[in-house]
UniProtKB/Swiss-Prot annotation:
Pathway: Amino-acid biosynthesis; L-arginine biosynthesis; L-arginine from L-ornithine and carbamoyl phosphate: step 2/3. Homotetramer. GO terms for cellular component: cytoplasm. InterPro entries: Arginosuc_syn_C, Arginosuc_syn_N, Arginosuc_synth, Arginosuc_synth_CS, Arginosuc_synth_type_1_subfam, AS_cat/multimer_dom_body, Rossmann-like_a/b/a_fold. It catalyses: L-citrulline + L-aspartate + ATP = 2-(N(omega)-L-arginino)succinate + AMP + diphosphate + H(+). This is Argininosuccinate synthase. ATP binds at residues 13-21, 40, 122.
Length: 403
């Protein structure tokens, strides 16, 4: 966006960190506008939110709005995505990606309520988040201007940002050296930068902020029981819980046993690769439980279709296309497939592993009588011969024609 565009009031997504603390006075100086700070509570922790309203006002914001989005994020974004089976590039449970659309949506709502004519985010010009935020803004508020300071200003280092605030007597507790970049919410914590920028470097202890080192995890395993209804976990160990409560409870259990760590090199939407250490303890447990019930309930073609939906959904969510017709259609299809995904799963947690050891469902298509290797009254093994001849007919014809 050009600086020449006239802006009267802007709502900035504010985290309380160095970047967004600089953005507030920078917006006032460069756009001569009123700045409203918006803080999304997505479960990043009380420490991150403590005193954040006062900090925003001290940086120059007129007001600061804090929205508690934790329950909605899990129930309306994370759990529906889980039903698709989405795993970006086969590993990533999309912790950062799923949080962005709800943050953007809530930011737009604040902008509407205060009569703002612009939105602002603190994402860099190299990452995926700028696309996720601005893609959501385009879908939800195409009439509002969007300001992305990192694509406009001349500040290039943390030292310059700290000097910028010091020159204006704006308090900031950030340090000069920031080794790692972290993003946290109720679903996951990601860590990037530092030693991880060289792929031959093994992650050190500082690369993990949440989970116990699996080697240091308890020597005794722990089992938990999860009740699944319509593709969502509704109770753990016999206790009914809301989606957010499920995640919080399983996060504690999983982190204690070192569950949910991945070290991944992923393909960013902007074209480059990035490496990160991601921790999703509760999410890993939930995902294992849902897939276990699906194995019992979904027939072969439905299972294959769900797998296809999961791959496509992972890219749509990662690429910031949550508010598109295609994403909505995939979520709706997954919801339909999940209607019979009901059951109970027992998972063993032990030194970094979440292993399904028991599973059952009233809707199970598994039949011990059919599956047994012994004699049964239902399946005549001689019937397989005709099926195989028809199934392999095209291969047989191709071979005969090639002679």
């Amino acid at each position: 966006m050009s600086k020449k565009v006239e802006v009267n009031k802007v709502v900035v997504a504010y985290s309380g960190g160095l970047d967004t603390s600089v953005i507030i006075p920078w917006l006032k100086e460069n756009y001569n506008c009123e700045v409203i700070a918006f803080v999304a509570d997505v479960g990043q922790g009380e420490e991150e939110l403590e005193g954040i309203e006062a900090k925003a006002i001290a940086s120059g914001a007129t007001e600061c709005y804090i929205a508690d989005l934790k329950e909605e994020m899990v129930s309306e974004y994370i759990f529906p995505t889980l039903k698709t089976g989405a795993l970006y590039e086969g590993k990533y449970l999309l912790g950062t990606s799923m949080a962005r659309p709800i943050i953007a949506k809530a930011q737009v709502e604040v902008a509407r309520n205060v009569g703002a004519d612009a939105l602002c985010h603190g994402c860099t010009g190299k990452g995926n988040d700028q696309i996720r935020f601005e893609g959501a803004f385009a879908a939800l508020a195409p009439d509002l201007h969007v300001i992305a300071p990192w694509r406009e200003w001349d500040l290039v280092s943390r030292e310059e940002c700290l000097d910028y605030l010091a020159e204006r007597n704006i308090p900031c507790t950030a340090s000069l050296t920031k080794i790692y970049s972290r993003d946290a919410n109720a679903w996951h914590i990601s860590t990037e930068g530092g030693v991880l920028e060289e792929t031959w470097n093994a992650p050190n202890d500082d690369c993990w902020a949440w989970t116990v080192d699996p080697e240091q995890a308890p020597n005794e395993s722990e089992t938990i029981s999860l009740k699944v209804e319509k593709g969502a976990v509704v109770a753990v160990d016999g206790k009914a819980m809301t989606p957010y409560e499920v995640v919080v409870y399983l996060n504690e259990k999983g982190a204690k046993h070192g569950v949910g760590r991945i070290d991944i090199v992923e393909n960013r939407l902007v074209g480059m690769k990035s490496r990160g250490c991601y921790e999703t303890p509760g999410g890993t447990i939930i995902n294992e439980a849902l897939r276990a019930v699906e194995q019992l309930v979904l027939d072969k073609t439905s299972f294959e279709f769900r797998e296809e939906l999961g791959i496509k959904a992972s890219h749509l969510v990662y690429d910031g296309r949550w508010f598109t017709p295609l994403c909505k259609s995939i979520l709706a299809a997954s919801e339909e497939l999940a209607k019979d995904v009901n059951g109970e799963v027992v998972i063993k947690l032990y030194k970094g592993h979440a292993t399904v050891i028991q599973k059952r469902s009233d809707n199970s298509l598994y039949s011990e009588e059919f599956a047994t290797f012994g004699a049964d009254e239902v399946y005549d093994q001689s019937h397989a011969e005709g099926f195989i001849r028809l199934y392999s007919l095209s291969s047989r014809i191709r071979a005969l024609n090639s002679k």
